Amino acid sequence: MFRLFALIAILFTSSAALADVGDDGLHEADWIRETFKDLREDHAEAEAEGKTLMIIVEQRGCIYCTKMHEDIFPIPEINAALHDNFFVVQINMFGDVDVTDFDGTTLPEKDMVRRWNALFTPLMIFMPSDVAEDATATGAAAAVMPGAFGKWTTLNLFNWIAIKGYEGDEPFQRYHARMLQEAGIVE
């Protein structure tokens, strides 16, 4: 009987750490917005909320997306940053839902991803406050984060974006190194 309860406890605790996955195979999170994927409208809404538009490109079965959703995004500081600072729109690398780019071009997700030359998932695209009407998302991006990174790189990038570090003189890599030094993580 003890073994049965132990097994049930293990199953419940291990499944609690797993991120939810939708019918399309993409991870679900309460900080991902359901929109019409018109990036101009999403950007305007993000700005109205005082947030940065973050476009995250993912795909079914992506082990690096899973790593981010299960190990990195749930970290309290990162989860708080996602809720407080970002308006997140998810794009399916192989999806068929129409996406309208900043220049007015409308394509299915998979074709828009190809237009952006996005090869890897996850891919996070962070938009600045001002985006030209003739721009593409990747052409106007304040920063692009391809792939899965650990806690400190992700947190420091989120913070650098939130303080609009991309508008200043300190590139992200120097900011990141300084933050690691100030936290006593590296010398």
Predicted regions and their residues:
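Thiol-based oxidoreductase modules, predominantly thioredoxin-like and allied folds used
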Residues: 31-35, 75-107
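N-terminal signal peptide c-region/cleavage motif recognized by signal peptidases
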Residues: 13-14
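Conserved redox-active cysteine motifs that mediate thiol-disulfide chemistry
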Residues: 59-73
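N-proximal helix/coil linker or "cap" segments that precede and/or mark the start of modular domains
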Residues: 19-32, 167
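Non-catalytic, surface beta->alpha helical segment in thiol-disulfide oxidoreductase systems
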Residues: 114-169
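A short beta-strand-turn-helix
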Residues: 34-53, 82
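Short active-site neighborhood of thiol/selenol oxidoreductases, capturing the structured segment around
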Residues: 49-63, 88
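Sec-dependent signal peptide recognition
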Residues: 1-7
